[in-house]
A protein has these predicted regions:
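Amphipathic alpha-helical domain-onset/packing element
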Residues: 135, 179-232
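Switch/communication elements of ASCE P-loop NTPase nucleotide-binding domains
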Residues: 1-55, 216, 230, 234-370
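P-loop NTPase switch/coupling surface
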Residues: 1-180, 378
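Soluble or luminal CAZymes and related metallo-dependent hydrolases
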Residues: 115, 119-122, 205-212, 257, ...
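Aromatic-acidic/polar surface patches that form glycan- and anion
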Residues: 32-33, 78-80, 202, 206, ...
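Charged/polar low-complexity intrinsically disordered segments, enriched in acidic residues
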Residues: 362-384
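Short coil/turn segments at secondary-structure boundaries
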Residues: 153-154, 229-232, 371-375
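Solvent-exposed, amphipathic alpha-helical segments
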Residues: 46, 188-191, 268, 375-382
Length: 384
């Protein structure tokens, strides 16, 4: 599954624009107000019908997705919505190479041309017959994510029954409800304890879904290990720096964000493709959309997060947005999409640049404040 091209008309700030994406990592870069978030929203909207077919939900095009212009006449202002609204995706989703959502007017429902529903019906029948079908991950992480726990009890988690299609729950806003995230982690901890009782094993080495999720976390933070649920404390815990155990909710925003992002993607993959076993993170394809990739992250982690995502989930197409020079400098030019007045282009060079060079070469920002630059220029002129 991948998105190769997206054509949008009258979507938020875009009148008519087309964007091309790489199969691997894509980072959208632009000044505030240039349309970064709107583009990521359009990418997510292009998959609404797929997500709804996988896990029925009340997600559809909204009025705020429709571009409007302000008409002024005799001192009065009118806000006029612009139609048609079009979101046209091209790529590869099961057997579909093109899919479209369109709305021709305010009184018209949105029209869909995708064939996703028919394809998903076939897949459901195959799964019911125990056929091993690979399901792609699809999830959108918005910029307002905080990853605060919700306090799910072990009792409720033990009663929870998971379907493969639960991997798509809340895909359109992955951090809106963390109860599924917590419930799964608690359930897997209880499952591990039950297996130890059944086998009378005393081993502390595990090769289960919880271990695979922790493997993804270690790609992000090498010294972070063993995210699990503690029955006595009734809390999620994680080991940081070998001998330091911290409750998940007491991690810094940056630590919690890194741990939860990698854990949630891995968790969804484990739910979607249990037949893949220990190779599930390496083999699961899909599209993951992340707004403000650098949010709450220390510059060192900003530099390492893209390589870590690529290593942990090599088959996934990432479409993300960021203003971080450290992240931009960790990517090749073809992986960076620079937005300027609604137009997209690739920078001449990015990979390996220091942050100051990225600011100047890619983001068109001076390395120093203008007043300082002027003083330095005068100083050098005097020295000469």
């Amino acid at each position: 599954m991948r998105l190769d091209r997206l054509h949008i008309q009258n979507f938020r700030c875009y009148e008519d624009a087309t964007f091309d994406f790489q199969p691997g990592f894509n980072l959208v870069v632009g000044v505030n107000g240039s349309g970064n978030t709107s583009l990521l929203q359009a990418v997510a909207v292009s998959f609404i019908e797929l997500g709804n077919a996988m896990k029925p939900a009340e997600i559809s095009l909204k009025n705020e997705d429709i571009r409007f212009v302000i008409d002024r006449l005799d001192g009065r202002s009118r806000y006029e919505r612009q139609y048609p609204l079009l979101v046209h995706g091209m790529g590869n989703v099961f057997e579909a190479t093109e899919w479209m959502m369109k709305r021709d007017g305010e009184s018209f429902p949105h029209l869909v041309d995708s064939g996703f529903g028919t394809q998903i019906d076939k897949i459901r029948k195959q799964i019911n017959l125990a056929v091993e079908v690979d399901l792609p991950v699809l999830v959108f992480y918005r910029s307002n994510r905080r990853w605060q726990g919700t306090g799910v009890s072990a009792e409720s988690a033990a009663k929870h029954r998971v379907s493969r299609f639960d991997g798509y729950l809340n895909w359109f806003d992955a951090v809106a409800d963390l109860s599924e995230f917590e419930s799964w982690l608690i359930g897997k901890t209880l499952e591990r304890m039950q297996n130890l009782l059944d086998t009378k094993s005393t081993s502390t080495e595990f090769d289960d879904e919880l271990a695979w999720v922790n493997g993804a976390i270690e790609c992000a933070i090498p010294k972070a290990q063993n995210l699990r649920y503690d029955l006595r404390l009734q809390s999620l815990l994680i080991d940081i720096d070998e001998h330091k155990t911290i409750p998940f909710n007491e991690l810094s925003d940056g630590q919690r964000g890194m741990v939860a992002l990698f854990a949630d993607i891995a968790r969804r993959m484990c739910i979607l493709n249990p037949h893949m076993g220990k190779d599930v993170l390496k083999k699961t394809p899909g599209v993951v959309i992340i707004d403000e990739l650098d949010i709450h992250l220390h510059p060192a982690w900003q530099r390492s997060i893209v390589p870590a995502l690529k290593k942990a989930f090599p088959k996934v197409q990432f479409i993300a947005a960021s203003h971080s020079p450290q992240i931009i400098g960790s990517l090749k030019p073809e992986e960076v999409i620079v937005l300027n007045d609604g137009n997209a282009s690739h920078p001449r060079v990015t990979y390996g640049l220091d942050s100051s060079s990225v600011l100047e070469e890619v983001m068109d920002v001076a390395q120093r404040e203008p007043e300082i630059e002027k003083l330095l220029s005068e100083l050098f002129s005097t020295l000469e």
